[in-house]
């Protein structure tokens, strides 16, 4: 457990509740003190849905600490079963309530004797895993539970006559998941593949027994769905594709892998003409990468940071498809760091694997990129350093749950990424116009370091003079001046200090 005011991936129970609330007619019960019950508020605020979040908190209070939790937890499970009539109730503790070391499995067994719904306890170690790992495991657990049930009742169906696919890992609170799901369905329809099931988003647990009838599973996000796909491969011999179709090159690679699996399964398909048509005529990305607009970006420096799926894909797109120099690429998925390093090593100069936001901020400040591609936190860092930022991965705020259609996957996703990349760089003329006519670039310079350890102060005259320096070199001048001041023991930076530093650097 770690005390922090910013986390890239939340605690384990958030992942479990994301999976439970993604399914249709599944209720989550969180055994937790009041401080841990923010999931409902967060989901209700961010997801644009009309229904209430199906999660109830079984509050751990002083009465529970005195008497034990069993009576209260069992009562909450049976009460929700009677009120909501769910198909499944998922009980999860939080890392805080896990300290009590209670036998929650016993509570579940007892409660299930008097409920119509199935009841399971999330099989997650709340001290060792984060939100993404817990989501992956909970999805696998629910799939296992219902397929074991179907197998015992002899209800496992045969494979469909024509090619079909399950899309695994589409969840609530995912980064552009709803739009990505729509785009993947369109892509599968264009390839002549029927979408059998999409889980967990809006899926019924009663339909999970239909999963084995698909020809293969598609796992667009490495973080959630991979464990379920591996289970289905082991138990039912179902192949899976775990290539995220982000960017023209990776989308083509994903489609070719699908083609290989279908042809091995007895189909006879050739998608090369489709790939060529989409790449040349439908997606604007290939044309954009050859245009003068993109050539203006060639050689510009950028940094990339996010979850594994999006950070890897974005690094490859910037480096391989747009000629942008990725100074470093990073991920907060430390548990899967080896895979990340292996994927990006040929496309960037350096790799950063950490979930410490201060370390990420300092790494950005050190290399002074022309643009940042990261999470909501890197957006804040960019504003403090006056560096533009495109948001490419969770965690994100409300502006990355857009009302309009903005997928990141598939061929339409490549167009969206092109727009994001181009609009993230401050163009030269825009910079000058902001200087001439006023705008966001003329406000007072923020003079804090990212780690908030600055021991220097700027006078008003010094800041005014600093503001006169063009935006694209202002950050560098500011840092050089502060280094000059520290070396000479100057605590207050005036106009004279600024000029003295300039002369020292020039000399």
UniProtKB/Swiss-Prot annotation:
Its EC number is 1.3.7.7. The active site is at residue 293. Binds 1 [4Fe-4S] cluster per heterodimer. The cluster is bound at the heterodimer interface by residues from both subunits. It comes from the Bacteria. Pfam families: Oxidored_nitro, PCP_red. Its cofactor is [4Fe-4S] cluster. It comes from Cyanothece sp. (strain PCC 7425 / ATCC 29141). Belongs to the ChlB/BchB/BchZ family. Protochlorophyllide reductase is composed of three subunits; ChlL, ChlN and ChlB. Forms a heterotetramer of two ChlB and two ChlN subunits. HAMAP family: ChlB_BchB. [4Fe-4S] cluster binds at residue 36. One of its GO terms (biological process) is light-independent chlorophyll biosynthetic process. This is Light-independent protochlorophyllide reductase subunit B. It is an enzyme of class 1 (oxidoreductase). One of its GO terms (molecular function) is 4 iron, 4 sulfur cluster binding. Keywords: 4Fe-4S, ATP-binding, Chlorophyll biosynthesis, Iron, Iron-sulfur, Metal-binding, Nucleotide-binding, Oxidoreductase, Photosynthesis. Pathway: Porphyrin-containing compound metabolism; chlorophyll biosynthesis (light-independent). The lineage of its organism: Bacteria, Bacillati, Cyanobacteriota, Cyanophyceae, Gomontiellales. It catalyses: chlorophyllide a + oxidized 2[4Fe-4S]-[ferredoxin] + 2 ADP + 2 phosphate = protochlorophyllide a + reduced 2[4Fe-4S]-[ferredoxin] + 2 ATP + 2 H2O. Substrate binds at residues 428-429. Component of the dark-operative protochlorophyllide reductase (DPOR) that uses Mg-ATP and reduced ferredoxin to reduce ring D of protochlorophyllide (Pchlide) to form chlorophyllide a (Chlide). This reaction is light-independent. The NB-protein (ChlN-ChlB) is the catalytic component of the complex.
């Amino acid at each position: 457990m770690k005390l922090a005011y910013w986390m890239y991936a939340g605690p384990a129970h958030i992942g479990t509740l994301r999976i439970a609330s993604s399914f249709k007619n599944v209720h989550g019960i969180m055994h937790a003190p009041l401080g841990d019950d923010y999931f409902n508020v967060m989901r209700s605020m961010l997801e644009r849905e009309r229904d209430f979040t199906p999660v109830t908190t079984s509050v751990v209070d002083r009465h529970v600490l005195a008497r034990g939790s069993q009576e209260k937890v069992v009562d909450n499970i049976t009460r929700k079963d009677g009120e909501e009539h769910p198909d499944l109730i998922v009980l999860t503790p939080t890392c805080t309530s896990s300290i009590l070391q209670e036998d929650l499995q016993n509570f579940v067994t007892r409660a299930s004797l008097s409920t119509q719904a199935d009841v399971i306890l999330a099989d997650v170690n709340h001290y060792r895993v984060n939100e993404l790992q817990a989501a992956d495991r909970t999805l696998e657990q629910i799939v296992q539970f219902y397929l074991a049930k179907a197998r015992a009742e002899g209800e496992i169906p045969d494979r469909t006559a024509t090619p079909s696919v399950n899309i695994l890992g589409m969840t609530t609170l995912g980064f552009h998941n709803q739009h990505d799901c729509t785009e993947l369905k369109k892509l599968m329809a264009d390839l002549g593949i029927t979408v059998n099931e999409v889980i967990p988003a809006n899926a019924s647990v009663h339909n999970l027994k239909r999963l084995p009838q698909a020809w293969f599973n598609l796992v667009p996000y490495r973080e959630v769905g991979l464990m379920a796909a591996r289970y289905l491969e082991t138990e039912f011999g179902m192949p899976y594709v775990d290539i995220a179709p982000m960017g023209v090159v990776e989308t083509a690679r994903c489609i070719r892998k699908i083609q290989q699996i279908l042809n091995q399964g007895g189909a006879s398909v050739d998608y090369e003409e489709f790939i060529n048509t989409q790449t040349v005529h439908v997606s604007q990305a290939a044309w954009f990468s050859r245009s003068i607009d993109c050539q203006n970006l060639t050689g510009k420096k950028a940094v990339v940071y996010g979850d594994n799926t999006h950070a890897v894909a974005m690094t490859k797109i910037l480096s391989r498809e747009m000629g942008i120099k990725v100074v470093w690429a990073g991920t907060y998925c430390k548990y899967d760091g080896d895979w990340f390093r292996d994927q990006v090593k040929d496309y960037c100069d350096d790799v950063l694997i950490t979930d410490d936001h201060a370390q990420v901020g300092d790494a950005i400040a050190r290399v002074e990129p022309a643009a940042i591609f990261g999470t909501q936190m890197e957006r804040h860092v960019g504003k403090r350093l006056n560096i533009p930022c495109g948001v490419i991965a969770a965690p994100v705020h409300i502006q990355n749950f857009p009302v309009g259609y903005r997928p990141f996957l598939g061929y339409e996703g490549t167009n969206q990424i092109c727009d994001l990349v181009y609009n993230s760089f401050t163009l030269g003329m825009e910079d000058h116009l902001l200087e001439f006519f006023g705008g966001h670039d003329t406000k007072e310079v923020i003079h804090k370091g990212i780690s908030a350890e600055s021991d220097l102060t700027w006078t008003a005259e010094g800041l005014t003079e600093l503001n006169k320096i063009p935006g694209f070199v202002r950050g560098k001048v500011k840092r050089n001046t502060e280094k000059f001041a520290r070396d000479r023991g100057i605590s207050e930076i005036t106009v004279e200090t600024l000029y003295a530093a300039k002369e020292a650097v020039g000399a």
